[in-house]
């Protein structure tokens, strides 16, 4: 199927300077869509970000990037003011993508000292059989685990030293509230804002990103997990209440993907190793594969997909 969008069709991507957001911006731009990216990055980071934006500029119908706080009233007003002028000739937002990764990764409970390094005894026995020091073996395993390919890391996962966590602070109510809004319910805020401005296309898509943390408890992920569950609930409500206006809302659950956002999560190396070992294809999901699917959801042929969570993980979630 050949995919071709009109330059009057816009993608508004929240969190579009890296990861899924950037990959999606590049993908839909290559197929002719105009792109608006909202991101928040330090000036020093822009040197690494601009080449990706240049790729989009080279093929998008039109492109604009806003480096500001997408969660503030002022930020939304700036974006909507600019887009209202740009789209005055008839352009409309075909796809609004929520890919904001701004959450608190503190522990919910203190670590139990008795629940520690499950692989320590195995490493000691292996070191003894090999005739090397346990510390030397641990360092070698850690090096291969962190720097080897996905298959090697997956095989060594059970022997690797456990992740380290910041135990100096724990999650508080305000941490939950901020994370749930930034990574969850702010989706509703943006949909309402774009809708009230009359900028949605007659046939539009609202897409957002979730993870298996919506069902599986991961240490240090409690606030983000709560946000993802809220996001999915909000998306279902959008799917029902905005359907009469031609807006379809879905959530994409990507497999474990090596990204800057993932690497911020304590224990991310262990998550990647376990995912690569479990995935039927023996590797991680890529941001580009997820972007390919999101692009498909923007086509006319996907108009009847509404109100669901769609896994894009190569079978990772269902593999035993």
Role assignments for model-derived ranges:
Residues 216, 281, 293-295, 306-320:
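Short C-terminal tail/terminal secondary-structure segment
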Residues 32-50:
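Conserved glycine-rich Rossmann-like NAD(P)H-binding loop of the short-chain dehydrogenase/reductase
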Residues 101-230, 235-244, 256-257:
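Catalytic loop of short-chain dehydrogenase/reductase
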Residues 248-258, 298, 311-313:
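Conserved SDR Rossmann-fold cofactor-binding beta-strand/turn motif
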Residues 97, 207, 249-252, 262, ...:
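Hydrophobic structural elements of the Rossmann-like NAD(P)H-binding subdomain
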Residues 56-74:
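Rossmann-fold cofactor-recognition segment
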Residues 48, 223, 244, 254-279, ...:
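A glycine/serine/threonine-rich, flexible loop-to-helix segment
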Residues 2-38:
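Canonical Rossmann dinucleotide-binding motif of NAD(H)/NADP(H)-dependent dehydrogenases/reductases
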